[in-house]
């Protein structure tokens, strides 16, 4: 018998002038909110086991998981609950949206486009994750947990088919359309009510382009919002909803949601929002359909966790394609990584695949450094990350690997972006060791930390973006397979595993310039709505405001759409809603304007409405003053 607790909380960081994380573009900085980012936590407790056996699963709408975030979350949870939640039984996975603020990372590389570490965004993420766990911890109660699987086509496409085609026929035959359609739904019921779901599917969080400046949970964020808010009627500002839906990743390293190809800069501005909604709806519909086919997940929970120095693993021949003993190498970025992807181009002068200049340089280096050649060739090396790592933590080398079990479901926690065939090999290996059905074993990427990509040794040879971003060389996947096999064998045999050596503490660097004191007639409405609107039209208003970063309003909102009901005004939308957008623009050196848009939904009740803006101004002494402003009334007919 399992008991389950659920919790949700806001983790939205700085909505103004903060570098966004995902595409690696320094000029892609936050300038508002389309949808808020959220953490969803699930506590599973096995009531049939002695003691207090628990598993904590957190799905966070973040670009990347980070070691320093995990460490601070676990430190805070230890202050609250002692040793109830630990590295071993806590799995934190990111949805990999490319539309979230960055600067929260402990390793310098990921903060280069954000002017370094951003304490406010880091705090919002940690505070929100911890809050979601607090809600889940308090919510634990007996539940019926069931499991189902499906197939979803039309929500992903292989963005590196030439690399995929290098795999052996047996692997390619498993994915005849070059995509991984496998979906999994964990359903949580209490009595007659479904109170929570966790859906797993492989597709990238790149429906929003690198030209977007609004915070968004991308397609998985929309899927969760649609089920909770649109279908379930959740009011996130009023407390914990009765139903919580998390949409998690599996192995989407080479999976793109842009099934019609990347959007060109000339595409209509609303196209990326349409793509986000469409791919999110596909995932929601798949999950909703599976509700009727779920069967009991089974008894028991278990977890194994270890750290591995991924740059110095001696891999036994049983885990390599040719049966030969191999060794991984220290992290190095290839020219293919610098090129970026078709949907997010990188630096000028680089291309995916072969780069003759860098290939020639690397061949010369390989002749002088045979161990490096054995690990990294044919990568055209552009940046050996080991060198900056000696000066300051730049990328992570000692990484966490995890295996957890909920009933008959096994989750392999990988701290990177596995391609679909890399994930398949990990799944097959665990399934064979523990005696599980392959469908019940998932490779969950973006878990607990981040090491970039995980390709198969065959895909690596193509040196597309994914291969160039497989930092530890051609045998990285093989090293992870060896480590995961040890965890699976220990779980099967009921043995503990050694934790291994933890990564050294990171040191945050920041060169963010302090913002000037705000100036202006705060709250003045400089563009009022029209008098009358119909469903399908857009209401817009512009306010004199202040820097949104003065108060992130975590758990709150920068805007409200309110409707007159008798003598009162009732909130019917906020800045977390799909129908609203909140845009910030700097005016001069210290001024701010905020534009608020509400796309009137088709089912909107006719009546009198207003738009309300909430802001906070900071003076020269650092004193904060909250203000609110309201438009004139307008009518929806």
Curated annotation (Swiss-Prot):
Its cofactor is Zn(2+); Mg(2+). GO terms for biological process: ceramide catabolic process; long-chain fatty acid biosynthetic process; sphingosine biosynthetic process. GO terms for cellular component: extracellular region; membrane; peptidoglycan-based cell wall. Mg(2+) binds at residues 34, 575, 577, 580. 10 minutes at 100 degrees Celsius abolishes completely the activity. Disulfide bonds: none annotated. InterPro entries: Ceramidase_alk, Ceramidase_neut_Mycobact, NCDase_C_sf, NEUT/ALK_ceramidase_C, NEUT/ALK_ceramidase_N. 90% of activity is inhibited by nickel, zinc and calcium ions. Magnesium, cobalt, copper and manganese ions inhibit between 50 and 80% of activity. Optimum pH is between 8 and 9. Zn(2+) binds at residues 96, 204, 417, 453. Signal peptide: none annotated. One of its GO terms (molecular function) is N-acylsphingosine amidohydrolase activity. It is an enzyme of class 3 (hydrolase). Its EC number is 3.5.1.23. The active site is at 256 (nucleophile). Binds 1 zinc ion per subunit. It catalyses: an N-acylsphing-4-enine + H2O = sphing-4-enine + a fatty acid; an N-acylsphinganine + H2O = sphinganine + a fatty acid; an N-acyl-(4R)-4-hydroxysphinganine + H2O = (4R)-hydroxysphinganine + a fatty acid; N-(9Z-octadecenoyl)-sphing-4-enine + H2O = sphing-4-enine + (9Z)-octadecenoate. Catalyzes the cleavage of the N-acyl linkage of the ceramides (Cers) to yield sphingosine (Sph) and free fatty acid. Also catalyzes the synthesis of Cers from Sph and fatty acid. Cers containning C6-C24 fatty acids are well hydrolyzed, and Cers with mono unsaturated fatty acids are much more hydrolyzed than those with saturated fatty acids. Belongs to the neutral ceramidase family. This is Neutral ceramidase. It comes from Mycobacterium tuberculosis (strain ATCC 25618 / H37Rv). The lineage of its organism: Bacteria, Bacillati, Actinomycetota, Actinomycetes, Mycobacteriales.
């Amino acid at each position: 018998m399992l008991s389950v607790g659920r919790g949700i909380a806001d983790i939205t960081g700085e909505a103004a002038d903060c570098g966004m994380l995902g595409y690696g573009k320094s000029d892609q900085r936050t300038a508002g909110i389309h949808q808020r980012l959220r953490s969803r936590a699930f506590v599973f407790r096995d009531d049939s086991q002695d003691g207090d056996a628990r598993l904590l699963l957190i799905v966070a709408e973040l670009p990347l998981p980070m070691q320093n975030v995990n460490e601070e979350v676990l430190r805070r949870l230890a202050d609250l609950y002692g040793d109830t939640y630990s590295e071993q039984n806590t799995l934190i996975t990111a949805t990999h949206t490319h539309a979230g603020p960055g600067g929260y990372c402990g390793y310098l590389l990921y903060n280069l486009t954000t002017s370094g570490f951003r304490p406010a965004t880091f705090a919002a993420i940690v505070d929100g994750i911890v809050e979601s766990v607090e809600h889940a911890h308090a919510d634990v109660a007996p539940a019926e947990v069931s499991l189902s699987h499906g197939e979803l086509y039309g929500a992903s496409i292989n963005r590196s088919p030439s690399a995929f085609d290098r795999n052996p026929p047996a692997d390619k035959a498993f994915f005849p359309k070059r995509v991984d359609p496998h979906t999994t739904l964990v359903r949580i019921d209490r009595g007659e009510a479904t109170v929570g779901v966790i859906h797993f599917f492989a597709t990238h969080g790149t429906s929003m382009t690198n030209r977007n400046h609004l915070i968004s949970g991308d397609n998985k964020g929309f899927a969760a919002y649609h089920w909770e808010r649109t279908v379930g009627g959740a009011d996130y500002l009023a407390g914990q909803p009765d139903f919580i839906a998390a949409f998690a990743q599996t192995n989407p390293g080479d999976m793109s949601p842009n099934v019609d190809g990347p959007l060109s800069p000339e595409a209509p501005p609303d196209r990326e929002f349409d793509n986000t909604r469409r791919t999110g709806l596909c995932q929601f519909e798949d999950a909703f359909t599976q509700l009727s086919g779920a069967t009991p997940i089974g008894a028991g929970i278990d977890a194994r966790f270890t750290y591995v120095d991924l740059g110095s693993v001696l891999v036994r021949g049983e885990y390599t394609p040719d049966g030969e003993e191999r060794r991984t190498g220290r992290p190095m970025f290839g020219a293919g990584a610098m090129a970026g992807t078709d949907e997010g181009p990188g630096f000028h002068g680089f291309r995916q695949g072969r780069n003759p200049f860098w290939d020639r340089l690397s061949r010369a280096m390989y002749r002088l450094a045979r161990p490096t050649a054995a690990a990294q060739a044919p990568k055209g090396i552009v940046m050996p990350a080991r060198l900056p790592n000696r000066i300051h933590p730049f990328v992570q080398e000692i990484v966490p690997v995890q295996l957890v079990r909920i009933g008959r479901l096994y989750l392999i926690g990988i701290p990177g972006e596995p391609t679909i065939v890399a994930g398949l090999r990990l799944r097959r290996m665990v399934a064979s060791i523990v005696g599980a059905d392959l469908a019940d074993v998932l490779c969950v990427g973006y878990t607990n930390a981040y090491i970039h990509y995980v390709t198969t040794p065959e895909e690596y040879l193509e040196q597309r973006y994914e291969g160039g971003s497989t930092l530890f060389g051609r045998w990285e996947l093989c090293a992870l397979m060896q480590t995961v096999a040890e965890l699976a064998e220990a779980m099967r045999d009921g043995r503990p595993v050694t934790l291994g050596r933890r990564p050294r503490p990171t040191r945050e660097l920041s060169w963010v310039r302090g913002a000037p004191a705000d100036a202006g007639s705060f709250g003045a409405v400089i563009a009022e709505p029209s008098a009358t609107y119909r469903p399908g039209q857009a209401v817009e208003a512009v306010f004199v405001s202040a820097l949104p970063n003065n108060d992130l309003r975590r758990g709150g909102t920068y805007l409200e759409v309110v409707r007159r009901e008798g003598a009162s005004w009732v909130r019917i939308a906020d800045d977390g809603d799909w129908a609203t957008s909140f845009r910030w623009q700097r005016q001069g050196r210290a001024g701010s304007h905020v534009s608020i848009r509400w796309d009137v939904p088709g089912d909107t009740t006719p009546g009198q409405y207003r738009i309300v803006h909430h802001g906070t101004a900071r003076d020269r002494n650092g004193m904060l003053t909250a203000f609110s402003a309201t438009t004139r009334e307008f009518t929806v007919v």
